[in-house]
Amino acid sequence: MSDQSDSDLSAETLRAIMSRPVAEPLPDPATPFEAEEDGDGPSDMPVDADISAVEECASLDHSDTDNGRRLLRHRGADLARMQETGSDKATWAAWDGKFWDVSDGAFQALAIAQTIGGLIGLEADFLGHTPPENAAIRKAARELDNKDAQAAKDAAIAALEKRQGKRRAFGVSSKNSARLNAMLACAAPHCAVKPEEWNAAQRLLYVENGTLRFIREEDPDRSGEQAAFKGHVEFTPEGWRRDDRVTRLMPVAYDPKAQCPKFRDFVARFLPEALVPGVARAVQIFCGLGLTGIPVQLLFFHYGLGANGKSVFLEVLARVYGALGEGLPAESITGQAQGAAGGASPDLARLPGVRFLRITELPQGEPLREALVKRLTGGEKMDVRTLFKGYFAFQPQFKAHMSGNGYPSIMGSDNGIWRRMAVVPWKVTIPPDEQRDFEEVVTELVAEAPGILNWLIEGMLAFDGEGLKLPPAMVDAAKDYRDEMDPISVFIDRCVRLNPEAEPVRARHAYECYSIWSDENGRKPLSETRFGRVMGQRFERREVSSANMYFGIELHDIPPRSARPRNPDEPGSDRP
């Protein structure tokens, strides 16, 4: 058999070895592989190695660029780089078989890269002779008595063996940290995925045993002037796909027959229909809507004194949603600090792909960062910056929930913030003798997770059929909240009306009327400066003869001032 045939046999033998079951035990981990002493290290080679890919990569060189190509050829389908602006540091995502793992993406990408060195070592068996070497070998086969020809053949064989040794040695060196990082860096530009491609399917939900797709369609069984719709859900067992670019999965297996009697009883007890009619239904629809990425300009504020079930309810949902949910500290949306322009926002950078956002218990009276709340619930893209990395934009998909025993302070009087605030009144208080350990109750309810998923699905299907309409109990609660936070707007609604023919009203007189109204309604009047700012935003104000005047309005239903003395500490000394 010729030397060229020996080379071909090596490749065939390798294929046979790779396809044959391993019968011999693995060596002791404390004993180095003999191949490592020769420059080969197959111990980290994946068991499902594609030998045809190894053969293709044998033609590549020993550069970091070609190592990047090797990584893409062998495992490119399992790697993606999340594209950011202004950063050369890749944020990696790795396919774990069900979804794209971003939280551990960097570690997974490194682990994948570590398998390439062993595959490079296998390339040695697919290296062939150069054309001159082949010519020398053929000549030696024809001229067996020609010593020069035989020497040339031996040199050709030795040259190939040398290249094979170098390739095996390069495979080992490719496992070193610097080579691994260089391999990933060279592969990164070729597997970048734009931010808008991630989690783009708003009506698609990944669960533990497959995928759920929510479909809205016209309902032929309902007639009327307007088109009627209904929703249904389609389940695909093990329907996870790389191309969906989904980064989060709900850790619950879908079972259409699963029930959650304890959870339903819990909701019925603490949001009873007799006390707060329609509230439980609205909460179910909003929470069910959280299974999807459909944007909605609402924030549910769960309000009530302690021992009323709201914290248990939100904690149960947070655990059912699992990685599909995320928590945001109260400090992120309260307080006066807005952060430096263009500064890092790592708390917000964790929110892409999130469907359930829980904002931790809010301190009473702490000012709400209204501009941020509008961004979080606006349905438009948000620009965020990761720590020490670059910028990217994403469209919020989550449904936001926050809770508190008291209201956070909202200073704005515009409808932009108030129409987003949906107050859920939790009015039932557990008697002390019925109170149980928090963790015990949560654990008991979370055990019904598959049934709770069906409860959420019911809510989503109801949204597709009837939409989300806030019941009077929630509308009234939100109005009470606004009246408490924005008494000037309440005064305007009750005592000011538009009248283009009316005489101008002095700003000082308007404030005095507001102060009288506040006194008679048991409220402390806000400062004249703030009153003037709100009035100036709502109505035309001009300075006439050194006095500020409002035009096009008239005051009405101003109560007479009571005889009680005015508190000298009350505000009102500064002019608008």
Identify the function of each model-found stretch:
Residues A462-A502:
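Conserved alpha/beta core segments of nucleic-acid transaction machinery
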Residues L79, T85-G105, L212-G353, A422-P425, ...:
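P-loop NTPase catalytic core of nucleic-acid-dependent motor ATPases
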Residues C57-G68, E366-M382, G532:
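A short, contiguous, amphipathic alpha-helix enriched in charged residues
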Residues G353-F356, K381-M382, P396-A400:
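Loop/turn-to-beta-strand initiation segments
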Residues E361:
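Walker B catalytic acidic pair
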Residues M1-V54, P560-P576:
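Glycine- and charge-rich intrinsically disordered segments
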Residues E24, D28-M250, A393, L526:
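Intein modules and their embedded homing endonuclease domains
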Residues I17, R319-S345, E366-E370, D383-Y391, ...:
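Positively charged interface segments
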